[in-house]
């Protein structure tokens, strides 16, 4: 298994699919990385040379991925909560942030139902 950005990339999958195992790299970004490095997106990782894998590592390093991206997202959410703005309050209360209805639905964000006490 090749290791790129601290993630073990599966050998038996196509390059584009394998790159999506990295947090912060989706299909579009993976295709851009393959185009920049000149690596065939349909080639499997096990068929790539060490030089090509190094090129992929260098190209992935240009993007914010894995722990840095998670930290950045958490810091942005924390900033909203500290500001006390509407979005921050919704994050703090564990409710949907983007204007979805909550009278019904929103169970994923709100958690399991709580029984009504009498």
From Swiss-Prot:
What biological-process GO terms show up in the record?
translation
> Cross-referenced InterPro entries, in alphabetical order?
Rbsml_uS13_C (IPR027437), Ribosomal_uS13 (IPR001892), Ribosomal_uS13-like_H2TH (IPR010979), Ribosomal_uS13_bac-type (IPR019980), Ribosomal_uS13_CS (IPR018269)
**Entries under Pfam families matching the protein:** Ribosomal_S13
First and last residue of the signal peptide: none
Q: Does the keyword Ribosomal protein apply?
A: yes
Q: Which domain of life, per UniProt?
A: Bacteria
GO CC terms: cytosol; small ribosomal subunit
Q: Where is this region: Disordered?
A: 93-118
Provide the alphabetized UniProt keywords.
Ribonucleoprotein, Ribosomal protein, RNA-binding, rRNA-binding, tRNA-binding
A GO MF term: tRNA binding
Report the function annotation for this chain.
Located at the top of the head of the 30S subunit, it contacts several helices of the 16S rRNA. In the 70S ribosome it contacts the 23S rRNA (bridge B1a) and protein L5 of the 50S subunit (bridge B1b), connecting the 2 subunits; these bridges are implicated in subunit movement. Contacts the tRNAs in the A and P-sites.
Name the family.
Belongs to the universal ribosomal protein uS13 family.
* PANTHER family in the cross-refs: 30S RIBOSOMAL PROTEIN S13/40S RIBOSOMAL PROTEIN S18 (PTHR10871), SMALL RIBOSOMAL SUBUNIT PROTEIN US13M (PTHR10871:SF1)
- Subunit structure, per the record? Part of the 30S ribosomal subunit. Forms a loose heterodimer with protein S19. Forms two bridges to the 50S subunit in the 70S ribosome.
Name of the protein in question: Small ribosomal subunit protein uS13
| Naturally occurring in which organism (per UniProt) | Pseudomonas fluorescens (strain Pf0-1)
Upper lineage ranks?
Answer: Bacteria, Pseudomonadati, Pseudomonadota, Gammaproteobacteria, Pseudomonadales
